[in-house]
Structures are given as C-alpha cells and as structure tokens.
C-alpha cells in the first residue's frame, strides 16, 4: 500500500521541534483533522516509551467513533500483527507503547483525579476540545503530565481557550 499524501499544514504533527508543547488543530468538517491526528498518534507508538492519552469530555462511544479511526490506519498500513486493540486502548506490541482512551467526565461526574494518576503520559490528545470549557480542569490534567526531561505534546482539537481565547 502506498502511504497517503499528507496535507502540509499537518506536517508539524509528524516532526515537531522538541520545545513545542501544544498543537491546536482546527478545521471544518472534511478537513482531515481526525485522519492526520490519528495517523500521527499511531506513528508515535513506534517509539518506545510513548504513552498517549486520547480523551474527550465523555468516551461512552469511543469503540464506535474514535478507535475505528485508528484501526483504519492499522489496516491501511497493513500492520495488524503489531497492535493489540481493545475498547479502551491500543498497544503497539513491538514497542509496548500505547494509546489509552479515557473520558474526562465519567457517568458519575468528574474523573480528573483518575486522569491525573496516569503515570508517564507523553502525549495528550483532547478531542472535541470545545466541549472542555473548564480551564482549571484542563490545567489540572495538563500540569499532571509534565515530566522532567520529557516533552509532553498536548493536542487540543478545534477551538479552545488557551491564551485567553474563549
């Protein structure tokens, strides 16, 4: 299979400088945001030690909406033997790096404490970030992932309130 042609504006997702912490991904329906983010995140799993947290406000239907975006790439690149896929995570068995799918809000309320307790997160993707209106809650999760000597990439998708935008 020939690798897909990537849209140039998404190139920084694949080869960002070390000092870049945030990528804010914007675009309308059909702008290939989900395609490029899932492609980049899947490729991150080929580096040992990557622990990617992929979150939305709620993740009740991740197995029918988000995870298929990743399994599509796994099929497209014909690397099925390299991945173990469940309803809550995708593990690259060649590197032991993985993607964890978690909601910020559980059905019983806020789940921030559980997200903060995740150790070693190297990348956080906040999908549908416009649903995340509580800046303090964002900061609580964001600051818990800062690791000395490790650049954690945070990728809020769509309009977001960083730098005072609301």
Task: Describe the predicted segments one by one.
Residues 1-166:
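Phosphate/NTP-binding elements of NTP-utilizing enzymes
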């Amino acid at each position: 299979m020939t690798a897909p042609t990537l849209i140039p504006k998404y190139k920084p997702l694949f080869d960002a400088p070390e000092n870049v912490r945030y990528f804010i991904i914007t675009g309308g329906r059909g702008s290939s945001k989900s395609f490029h983010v899932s492609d980049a995140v899947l490729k991150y799993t080929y580096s040992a030690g990557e622990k990617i947290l992929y979150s939305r406000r709620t993740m009740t239907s991740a197995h029918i909406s988000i995870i298929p975006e990743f399994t599509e790439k796994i099929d497209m690149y014909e690397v099925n033997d390299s991945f173990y896929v469940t309803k809550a995570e995708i593990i690259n068995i060649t590197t032991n790096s993985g993607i964890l799918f978690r909601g910020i809000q559980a059905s019983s309320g806020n789940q921030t404490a559980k997200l903060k307790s995740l150790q070693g997160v190297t990348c956080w993707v906040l999908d549908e970030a416009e649903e995340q209106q509580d800046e303090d809650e964002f900061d609580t999760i964001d600051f818990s992932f800062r690791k000395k000597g490790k650049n954690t990439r945070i990728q809020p998708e769509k309009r977001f309130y960083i730098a005072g935008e609301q």
